[in-house]
Amino acid sequence: MSKALLTKAVITLGAIFALQSSPSIASEGQEWIVDNETSHFHFVSVKNNAIGEVSTFETLKGHLSGNGQFALEILLDSVNTGIEIRDQRMKEHLFDSKTNVAFIVNGSFDLEKIKDQKAGESSQHTLEATIQLGSETLDIQAPVTIQTLADDQLRVTSVKPVVIATSSLKLDGGVDKLKSLAGLRSIDRVVPVTFDLYLKPKSE
């Protein structure tokens, strides 16, 4: 066999091996969990029509199953505004975190849409989900980028903020209480939310 033919054969075999060994994202048995250490969830509040403040929830739990069902828990006790007294007021008067443990987000996504993505590749999609707080629910649509990473990991990032009205989850009374306690003229009733979630394969 000539050197050129040998080289071509090696390249062809290598390509076939790479395709055969590439893991399938849309495997029914696959399951991912949210990596809390690297994931982020932020929201912006605006007071007195002029001052915007970025806050976060520091504890996120969630999973994505091989059939595309996903769930995310945003623990309310983990709210971090950068000011401790404000955190406590939000937990007590806005979220009632002793009764309501978390925002719960549920939805589904067709994993077939990303099954051919290789590590480093990404694509944009719209996630349809339901947010629940206590007995209140809100349907949302979230434009996201889904990136396939090494080791079967996924990254799901909001393309633009998801804007949530406080009235949709019956939070207006809590907002009024916070405004009164802080001596503010106003607190905006629409809240932009962004997220950057890393999902890793669930270990057995």
Predicted regions and their residues:
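Bacterial N-terminal signal peptides that target proteins for export
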Residues: M1-I11
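Serine/proline-rich low-complexity intrinsically disordered segments, especially terminal tails, linkers
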Residues: A4, P23-A26
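Low-complexity, acidic/polar, glycine-enriched regions of mature
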Residues: I25-E204
